């Protein structure tokens, strides 16, 4: 009896397992998510063959944004504040920079400064240059009369032998020696001329004999105002001419319309009288 019961139980359990397997296979499968670990899933899809799809875990962004209030105080102040030099460079307007006087401009060479001063203050520079040049040449001529020999100095500074031989073998005497010294001292002469011109210009401006040149910004602004006024006047004249022509055309059209109306009314009246 015991053996029969055991056999019956085993047969029943095997039948039950077979039934469950068959029912599992026959039942429609939609989606069976199985959580293996955090962030990954295995899905069983209703297809003819079993496909196991692994969904990758969502990766978090490694680069996290730090809010502004979490930054250190030093970095936060540096990001919010702008350096004074940057502010000054931004706020600097090129039109506000005035043209520098060539007598005070040390950024250009001596010869360029001399030419620029000649173009701007030629009436003052020419007399100053003549006076200083006369003093320079007279001083060198007097030195040549006293026996000053400039030939060793010319050989020392490395001038060509042709120029040195001309001075050695020339019969010009003191005048040629003075002229050679005068040409050698050209940088010093130009410097003295510019200094004398600067002093003379300041003196003449102080006592009203020489007007102060306007700034470039003011000059261009005045020219722009003059051009604007001329343009406005021309526009007003053109507008008046156009408005006059339009009024004349309007009057002519009105006259023609009135004549046409009168003719039409006259014809209508005439036809009515005839009827």
From Swiss-Prot:
Keywords: Coiled coil, Cytoplasm, Membrane, Mitochondrion, Transmembrane, Transmembrane helix. Its main location: membrane. It is a single-pass membrane protein. Residues 51-100 are annotated as: Disordered. GO terms for cellular component: cytoplasm; membrane; mitochondrion. Residues 56-65, 75-95 have a biased composition (Polar residues). Pfam families: FAM210A-B_dom (PF06916). Residues 221-275 form a coiled coil. Residues 105-217 form the DUF1279 domain. It is found in: Membrane; Mitochondrion; Cytoplasm. The keyword Glycoprotein does not apply. The chain crosses the membrane at residues 124-144. InterPro entries: FAM210A/B-like (IPR045866), FAM210A/B-like_dom (IPR009688). Belongs to the FAM210 family. May play a role in the structure and strength of both muscle and bone. This is Protein FAM210A. The lineage of its organism: Eukaryota, Metazoa, Chordata, Craniata, Vertebrata.
